[in-house]
């Protein structure tokens, strides 16, 4: 396993950081100070020094004959350059040599059971070196719940992170130089790889687009669409039965369109199976019924908007006219969005002839005037329509008689239309 040495240069001493021991200032002054240059070196041919004397011997004797331009003679695998290669300032005069030893505790990280590379496990003393010691009464217990003791390891983890932060730099040169006397080893992992949080598995989190409220709204929308689709099919089937019953006052006969290849049972012409010849005609009738229903809805919407005065149409024959200056008559009915509307003409004399648009039934008056201009015989119906409008009691009696006559047949087809009638009534009231 490779070891990292951080070497810094100053006029008096050489400082090095060794993972297993700590930071040293050499007590021996180098003879050739230009040999030692700043950098972080990774080597595999050296063992960890046990004390400062071994480190001085390694730094002074082993590295002073290295050609730093070509890196010849240095047992190094990779070199990570520092941010600044300028020598640090001269230390204080009263600075003394420091020798200390770091005793790292066990680093317990959830999901990572191995010892991180770059750290050397503490050596267990043997009986040969330190003499025989009494056997402890109870062996140390193995930590089986690392997540419960994570708070107690904060100090050791912080020391390990600080040490590796000194080794890492902003710029790395991935140039490996092979040494014939050493064996290459992979680089020491950085803090991000050693102390990376363990990956957790579980239920995937819902994205903001698929929150529970939006999912509920989607399901409710699908239910409403399905309900409306079933009602539309029921309305078409009932209207088809009603239209067919008008052609057969004595009752709807059985369908006679039988297929020679697929014999079908007896059925009504309003519920033909796909194997029957009348199946296509049945769906053609229902398609025409759909078109008529859409046309009725469009007519109802136009009548409602015309009654509210939201369709500004200039009448063909205005009843009242006013003449104003053309400078004041610059806005037409299409450019105004709030009543009252007016229609203006600009003659050559310099004055404008304007007449107001009716506040209600403007489209109806326009269509009636357009029809009277092309069909003159409609003028004969004006007294009749005025008479029917004046005798409201007779009109009510006629309506009651028609409902009494067609009541039983209408009761079977009106229930599917009740939601539509309620919707139209609400639109009529609140618009």
UniProtKB/Swiss-Prot annotation:
Intravirion side: 2-286, 236-286, 401-406
InterPro entries on file: HBV_HBSAG (IPR000349)
Region span, Pre-S: 2-207
Sequence ranges on the Virion surface membrane side: 2-214, 308-379, 430-431
The entry's keywords: Acetylation, Caveolin-mediated endocytosis of virus by host, Fusion of virus membrane with host endosomal membrane, Fusion of virus membrane with host membrane, Glycoprotein, Host-virus interaction, Lipoprotein, Membrane, Myristate, Transmembrane, Transmembrane helix, Viral attachment to host cell, Viral envelope protein, Viral penetration into host cytoplasm, Virion, Virus endocytosis by host, Virus entry into host cell
Region (Pre-S2): 149-207
A GO-annotated cellular component: membrane
Compartments where found: Virion membrane
Presence of keyword Zinc: no
Lipid-anchored residues (N-myristoyl glycine): 2
Transmembrane intervals: 215-235, 287-307, 380-400, 407-429
Glycan-bearing residues: 351
Positions of the UniProt region annotated as Disordered: 115-147
Function noted in UniProt: The large envelope protein exists in two topological conformations, one which is termed 'external' or Le-HBsAg and the other 'internal' or Li-HBsAg. In its external conformation the protein attaches the virus to cell receptors and thereby initiating infection. This interaction determines the species specificity and liver tropism. This attachment induces virion internalization predominantly through caveolin-mediated endocytosis. The large envelope protein also assures fusion between virion membrane and endosomal membrane.
Record comment regarding domains: The large envelope protein is synthesized with the pre-S region at the cytosolic side of the endoplasmic reticulum and, hence will be within the virion after budding. Therefore the pre-S region is not N-glycosylated. Later a post-translational translocation of N-terminal pre-S and TM1 domains occur in about 50% of proteins at the virion surface. These molecules change their topology by an unknown mechanism, resulting in exposure of pre-S region at virion surface.
Family: Belongs to the orthohepadnavirus major surface antigen family.
Record protein name field: Large envelope protein
Organism per entry: Woodchuck hepatitis B virus (isolate 2) (WHV)
